[in-house]
């Protein structure tokens, strides 16, 4: 299976060009991380893959499962160091109110951004973040 990741990296520029792709979503990078038992190999392969995406010139969104021990980190703690932005999507529960969807921007490289957790919703038109609202 690891050879297929190398193959995808090799085919990526051609596929991006053939589809005229400007954006790419990979759900989930956690599956790629699980392909490698060796931590050093995992880190190298994921680094090479994310570099290939950047070189292909597409805006890329990677989803990742959170670590069980730290909900603000990816399972293997690699991807957040290789990306330009990290967004944490979570459910926020309150004893007295309904569960809300919340987004927190952990990092956006070379940009100032809010450090506040904000409510959001996903609609047929995309994602809406309620910048002026608070969670509860």
What feature does the model see in each segment?
Residues 20, 57-58, 83-84:
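Residue-level detector of structured alpha->beta connecting loops
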Residues 2, 22, 39-43, 69-76:
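Conserved phosphate/pyrophosphate-binding and hydrolysis machinery centered on Walker-type P-loop NTPases
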Residues 35-66:
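Substrate-engagement module of ASCE P-loop NTPases
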Residues 10, 14, 44-51, 81:
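Alpha-helical scaffolding segments of alpha/beta enzyme cores, especially the outer helices
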Residues 1-36:
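Conserved inter-motif catalytic segment of the P-loop NTP-binding fold
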Residues 64-125:
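Phosphate-binding/switch region of NTP-binding enzymes
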Residues 13-20, 118-136:
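NTP-binding/hydrolysis catalytic cores, primarily Walker-type P-loop NTPases
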